[in-house]
């Protein structure tokens, strides 16, 4: 077959394969054209899920009679003229393909009138050559586009359309997304002549929140946290749901870049990281977030349907989004999906200790138990009340007796083939299986409890291993071993600046070597400002503005103490910041921790502060009493 130039209609139909996927794609392209035309009212009429009719009416600037023919031609647009225009594009559309592509797979009528014209004109492309005919029409200032019988001339495409209900659901979701992107525009959606959605223009904060509630639902608003952050020429604002407002599916996740609807992997990854450890694996965050930046710093011409963008400084944007959301969530005082709490009296015989200890721990220095009065300035988002006390009140416990060690201290191993039980959320212990009873004298893993404890059994006796305490113990020992060489520092793409009083600024300069050993590098940012440029991986996902003043306070209090004692305290502090009480574990991670504990501590795991006996006596007596 010789090379030939394709007929216009076939070329447009090929282009329509990328632009026009389904009726909602047509609605998207046409509504975006209306918004680019400056419309503040857009009406959308749908019949039969869009298969029979799609009509978009707006009150925008309209298209002049002389430009109607061009409007239905390929690669004809008023939005770009040079490469510089494309690289800094602000409009939603810019390729000039939508109308030509849609008209090639439907019967399209384009009616428009500008403010300067006394009458409206109507254009329609017909025939093999897509010749455009123009005739007078009655129409107010603005534009109406009617798309009738979508895919009438491409039966294969029409065959793949879903049911009327499904196709309209896609259109409805699209309109919801548009409603959140342009609060200043009134949107009306009708289906088969019935008004389904009506969003009035929202110009005040209260009106915007009402629209947000109308789109996302009242439950979202009950848990919504307003966020706003700015760095250099990048701004992030919007709303995100606290963890208790998480959903069973990801149907309330809306992100916009310079007003453009977006499903970007980089943005989604940063948001997931910000929620890390706050949500169980079967729950999804809900959010409506807007990112604004210099149009020259983002490439929107990377996806046929413009669903994705490419940031020129992707890592910078990722870290900015993560840090802004992470800080907002933690400063709000949110709690994770799990909090370590004392277990019920019927299950655990010993109270849960408030601090993490370990066998053979060296006694704390006297100064470390003292209360501190330092509070960071308000401009640095002052340290949470009581954080200094929490950091300073470590009391050395009494070491476990030999009898206690013998009573609990057999080697802990994992039974081959053991796996998680059904629901790990129950706090009641499970009865050992027959397989578990085949290994007398050895503790064996049974299941997770509340995704934070590992249930163990030995000779019919049950016990709980605190996974947070186990991981903290392992990390603490690793830090002490690595202390001599120092922790590796990782650069922050977004350096953190905060104000400090003069005494702490002097402390930073005096203890520069110690801070570098912890993987922290700071430099002066002015009279009373310090800038944090590098941190250890352990602290990369923490609220650094809150933690740094707390750390400096601890160093100041212990500056006169023995170097080894100070190292001990600082390692413990790093551990507590790096591993949250709210961390969630899966069974494989729990088994890995158990294996490492066995390798490092052997029978010293008898320490009752990490492994606690579970008593079923009360429950069994109750069963016996009930007969």
Swiss-Prot record:
Keyword vocabulary terms for this entry: DNA damage, DNA repair
Q: Where is this region: Disordered?
A: 376-404
Query: Which InterPro entries does the record match to this protein?
Result: DNA_mismatch_repair_CS (IPR014762), DNA_mismatch_repair_MutL (IPR020667), DNA_mismatch_S5_2-like (IPR013507), HATPase_C_sf (IPR036890), MutL/Mlh/PMS (IPR002099), MutL/Mlh/Pms-like (IPR038973), MutL_C (IPR014790), MutL_C_dimsub (IPR042120)
GO terms assigned for molecular function: ATP binding; ATP hydrolysis activity; ATP-dependent DNA damage sensor activity; mismatched DNA binding
Q: What's one Pfam family the UniProt record gives for this protein?
A: MutL_C
What CDD domains would the database entry show? HATPase_MutL-MLH-PMS-like (cd16926), MutL_Trans_MutL (cd03482)
- Respond yes or no to whether keyword Amino-acid biosynthesis is given for this record: no
Q: Name one GO cellular component term.
A: mismatch repair complex
Query: Which GO BP terms sit in this record?
Result: mismatch repair
Which HAMAP family would you find in this protein's record?
DNA_mis_repair (MF_00149)
Q: Which family does it belong to?
A: Belongs to the DNA mismatch repair MutL/HexB family.
Task: Explain the purpose of this protein.
Answer: This protein is involved in the repair of mismatches in DNA. It is required for dam-dependent methyl-directed DNA mismatch repair. May act as a 'molecular matchmaker', a protein that promotes the formation of a stable complex between two or more DNA-binding proteins in an ATP-dependent manner without itself being part of a final effector complex.
- What this protein is called in its record is DNA mismatch repair protein MutL
Which classification does the entry list for the species?
A: Bacteria, Pseudomonadati, Pseudomonadota, Gammaproteobacteria, Aeromonadales
């Amino acid at each position: 077959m010789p090379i030939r130039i394709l007929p216009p209609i076939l070329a447009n139909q090929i282009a329509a394969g990328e632009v026009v996927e389904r009726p909602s794609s047509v609605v998207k392209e046409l509504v975006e054209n209306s918004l680019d035309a400056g419309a503040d009212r857009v009406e959308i009429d749908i019949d039969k899920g869009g298969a029979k009719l799609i009509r978009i009416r707006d009150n925008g600037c309209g298209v002049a009679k002389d430009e109607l023919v061009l409007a239905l031609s390929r690669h004809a647009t008023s939005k770009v003229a040079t490469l510089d225009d494309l690289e800094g594009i602000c409009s939603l559309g810019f390729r000039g393909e939508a109308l030509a592509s849609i008209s090639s797979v439907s019967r399209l009528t384009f009616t428009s009138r500008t403010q300067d014209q006394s009458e409206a004109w109507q254009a329609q492309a017909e025939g093999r050559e897509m010749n455009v005919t123009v005739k007078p029409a009655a129409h107010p200032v603005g534009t109406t586009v009617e798309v009738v019988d979508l895919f009438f001339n491409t039966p294969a495409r029409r065959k793949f359309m879903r049911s009327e209900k499904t196709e309209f659901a896609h259109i409805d979701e699209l309109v919801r997304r548009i409603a959140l992107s342009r609060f200043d525009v009134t949107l009306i959606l009708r289906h088969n002549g019935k008004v389904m959605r009506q969003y009035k223009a929202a110009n005040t904060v209260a009106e915007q929140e009402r629209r947000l509630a109308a789109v996302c639902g009242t439950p979202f608003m009950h848990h919504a946290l307003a966020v706003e952050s700015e760095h250099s020429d990048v701004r992030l604002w919007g709303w995100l749901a606290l963890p208790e407002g998480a959903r069973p599916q990801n149907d309330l996740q809306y992100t916009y870049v310079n007003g453009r609807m977006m499903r970007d992997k980089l943005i989604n990854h940063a948001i997931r990281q910000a929620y890390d450890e706050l949500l169980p694996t079967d729950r999804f965050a809900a959010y409506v977030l807007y990112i604004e930046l210099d149009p020259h710093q983002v490439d929107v011409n990377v996806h046929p349907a413009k669903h994705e963008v490419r940031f020129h400084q992707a890592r910078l944007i990722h870290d900015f989004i993560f840090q802004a959301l992470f800080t907002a969530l933690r400063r709000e005082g949110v709690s994770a999906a799990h909090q370590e709490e004392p277990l019920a009296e019927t299950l655990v015989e010993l109270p849960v200790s408030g601090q993490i200890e370990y066998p053979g721990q060296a006694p704390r220095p006297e100064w470390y138990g003292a209360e501190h009065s330092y509070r960071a300035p308000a401009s640095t988002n002052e340290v949470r009340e009581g954080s200094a006390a929490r950091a300073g009140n470590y009391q050395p416990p009494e070491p476990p007796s030999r009898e206690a060690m013998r009573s609990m201290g057999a080697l802990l191993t994992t039974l081959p083939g053991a796996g998680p039980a059904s629901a790990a959320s129950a706090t009641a212990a499970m009865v050992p299986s027959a397989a578990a009873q085949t290994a007398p004298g050895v503790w064996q893993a049974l299941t997770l409890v509340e995704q934070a404890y590992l249930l163990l059994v030995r000779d019919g006796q049950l016990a709980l291993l605190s996974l947070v305490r186990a991981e903290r113990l392992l990390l603490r020992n690793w830090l002490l071993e690595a202390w001599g060489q120092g922790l590796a520092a990782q650069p922050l793409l977004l350096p953190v600046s905060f104000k400090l009083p003069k005494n702490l600024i002097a402390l930073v300069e005096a203890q520069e070597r110690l801070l570098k050993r912890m993987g922290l590098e700071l430099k002066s940012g002015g009279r009373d400002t310090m800038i944090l440029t590098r941190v250890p991986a352990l602290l990369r996902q923490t609220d650094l503005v809150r933690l740094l003043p707390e750390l400096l306070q601890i160093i100041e209090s212990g500056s006169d103490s023995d170097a080894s004692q100070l190292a001990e305290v600082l390692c413990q502090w790093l551990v507590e910041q790096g591993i949250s009480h709210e961390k969630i574990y899966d069974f494989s991670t729990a088994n890995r921790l158990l294996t490492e504990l066995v390798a490092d501590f052997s029978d010293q795991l008898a320490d009752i502060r990490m492994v606690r006996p579970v008593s079923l006596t009360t429950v069994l007596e109750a069963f016996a009493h009930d007969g």
